[in-house]
Amino acid sequence: DKCVRAVAKRFTGVEHRIELVRELNGVKYYNDSKGTNPDAAIKAVQAMVTPTVVIGGGYDKGSEFDLYVKAFKDRVKLLVLIGQTSDKIEATAKKYGFTNIIKAESLKEVVDICAENAKDGDAVLLSPACASWGMFDNYEQRGRLFKEYVNAL
């Protein structure tokens, strides 16, 4: 019992799964690059307890994004999109009245946009709801680059 509690206290989570990268200027940056489908990304969005800037988009596996966008209600203040699905996710978001959207060309640009728009007390969440292919070799590479860019801020 004592041993289990000690291990639980030291456990920092699993890489790329709602992983806290750092807190900077009161903004917490989370890497959930493993959120490669809408269902996984919804769970990450629902785990956020402060206003959140969500980074979404990537390779189009034919997913629908209606439930993903509906999960934004009263949680997400800005959606920053990247990759092949940018237009599809943007159209779905606008269909449900969510219009605070910025599109970017690179992950570095995404991180810079998030840093400019997130305020003290906010969270920034990379939970793309899409595969990484096309821009990255895999979700691990995408997540590690995200962490590198965030740590360089």
Task: Give residue spans per PLM region.
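Nucleotide phosphate-binding/pyrophosphate-handling subdomain across enzymes
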Residues: D1-V76
